[in-house]
Curated annotation (Swiss-Prot):
Organism encoding this protein: Mycobacterium tuberculosis (strain ATCC 25618 / H37Rv)
Subcellular location: Secreted, Cell wall; Cell surface
Taxonomic placement: Bacteria, Bacillati, Actinomycetota, Actinomycetes, Mycobacteriales
InterPro entries assigned to the protein according to its UniProt record, in alphabetical order: PPE_C (IPR022171), PPE_dom (IPR000030), PPE_sf (IPR038332)
Name of protein: PPE family protein PPE32
Listed GO CC annotations: cell surface
Role played: Virulence factor that modulates the production of host cytokines. Interacts with host TLR2 receptor at the macrophage cell surface and induces the secretion of the anti-inflammatory cytokine interleukin-10 (IL-10) and the pro-inflammatory cytokines TNF-alpha and interleukin-6 (IL-6), via coactivation of MAPK and NF-kappa-B signaling pathways. Also increases the expression of IL-12p40 and IL-32 through activation of the ERK1/2 signaling pathway. Can induce cell apotopsis in macrophages via activation of caspases and increase reticulum endoplasmic stress response.
Length: 410
């Protein structure tokens, strides 16, 4: 503690009047009171919630454990609320102490007036006539000194008592900090144990079923049960393979990079398809009967150069085949029908067909159809022959002859 008695009243009074006053202390007291109210409300809410859960909807060992874990925290909230309320009350006491000390302190203007009077009396004390007044002024100044020192001593003691607060404690640890990591480890261990136990169980079942299945196969009378046993064995094998090669197994995860290689190969294959498509869609020279259209490969009809003069035509020069009007070239190209004997000298005339077999394979109606087919084939071949343009006139190809062989019936 400072020795306020050794300090003149100018310093003590100046310090008291230079500060912000009791306003910050009163604001701190109000803040502490608000915090205490919120903590009391939180403690009441916690308590009512836990009581409501453990009484009706949630009962049993878990609810008891949870209530026991939360109880220390609720108690800490209540204790902290009381401490906050006490801090607010002490802040109010400190503000009151300051007001008391401020009222007991001599105002600085009074001290300044005393000092000014003393200087004036000393300056005018030529013959000693101001000596009593100077003594009275000094006595008044000593009283102000003592008054400020007493006020400061009282304020220091009271403020020290008001500022002694109980230390706040940290909230208790109601949860296990390593619970999350432990839970993750337990879950992973349980998952691995479940997977390994599943595969082990399937293998054990397969090994136990294999002897009985082989024994049942040795007996023909139990074929049905043997097939049922094999079904069980195959099902066990399928389950084991599914666990080993599933989408989330090590083998399944190892196949993921292969998909990228497959996609990369398909992208490279796209570049190799371009030359084949270009060769397929590219222009080609016309051949055969389409060779006259070769100038069109450039895509422009104007590239065709006329071959000789223009084509000529005539009117009223057609001939008739029955009631059908056909070009003259058809009649000129039609072959002359000759007998088989004239074409093949070694072949004699065909014997007369028996009248009693009109429905035979080589009857009159069948033979007449052969002759009709010969005429039709000649007309079709003559009409379907490719025409050539030369010198402005159309010339027909020479029609090929058709030989008809008549086989006598037995």
């Amino acid at each position: 503690m400072l020795d306020f008695g050794a300090l003149p009243p100018e310093i003590n009074s100046g310090r008291m009047y230079a500060g912000p006053g009791s306003g910050p202390l009163l604001a701190a007291a109000a803040a502490w009171d608000a915090l205490a109210a919120e903590l009391y409300s939180a403690a009441a809410s916690y308590g009512s919630t836990i009581e409501g859960l453990t009484v009706a909807p949630w009962m049993g060992p878990s609810s008891i454990t949870m209530a026991a874990a939360v109880a220390p925290y609720v108690a800490w909230i209540s204790v902290t609320a009381g401490q906050a309320e006490q801090a607010g009350a002490q802040a109010k006491i400190a503000a009151g102490v300051y007001e008391t000390a401020f009222a007991a302190t001599v105002p600085p203007p009074v001290i300044e007036a005393n000092r000014a009077l003393l200087m004036s009396l000393v300056a005018t004390n030529i013959f000693g006539q101001n000596t009593p007044a100077i003594a009275a002024t000094e006595a008044h100044y000593a009283e102000m000194w003592a008054q400020d020192a007493a006020a400061m001593y009282g304020y220091a003691g009271s403020s020290a008592t008001a500022s002694q607060l109980a230390p706040f404690s940290e909230p208790p640890q109601t949860t296990n900090p390593s619970a999350t990591a432990a839970q993750s480890a337990v879950v992973a261990q349980a998952a691995g144990a479940a997977a390994s136990s599943d595969i082990t169980a399937q293998l054990s079942q397969l090994i136990s079923l294999l002897p009985s299945t082989l024994q049942s196969l040795a007996t023909t009378a139990t074929a049905t049960s043997a097939s049922a046993g094999w079904d069980t064995v195959l099902q066990s094998i399928t389950t084991i393979l599914a666990n080993l090669t599933g989408p989330y197994s090590i083998i399944g995860l190892g196949a993921i990079p292969g998909g990228w290689w497959l996609t990369f190969g398909q992208i490279l294959g796209l570049a190799q398809n371009a030359p084949g498509v270009a060769a397929l869609l590219g222009p080609k020279a016309a051949a055969g009967a389409l060779s006259p259209l070769a100038p069109l490969r450039g895509g422009y009809i104007g590239d065709i150069t006329p071959l000789g003069g223009g084509a000529t035509g005539g009117i009223a020069r057609a001939i008739y085949v029955g009631s059908l009007s056909v070009p003259q070239g058809w009649a000129e190209a039609a072959p002359v029908m000759r007998a088989v004997a004239s074409v093949l000298p070694g072949t004699g005339a065909a014997p007369a067909l028996a009248a009693e077999a009109p429905g035979a394979l080589f009857g009159e109606m069948a033979l007449s159809s052969l002759a009709g087919r010969a005429l039709a084939g000649t007309a079709v071949r003559s009409g379907a022959g490719a025409a050539r343009v030369a010198g402005g006139s159309v010339t027909e190809d020479v029609a090929s002859t058709t030989t008809i062989i008549v086989i006598p019936a037995d």
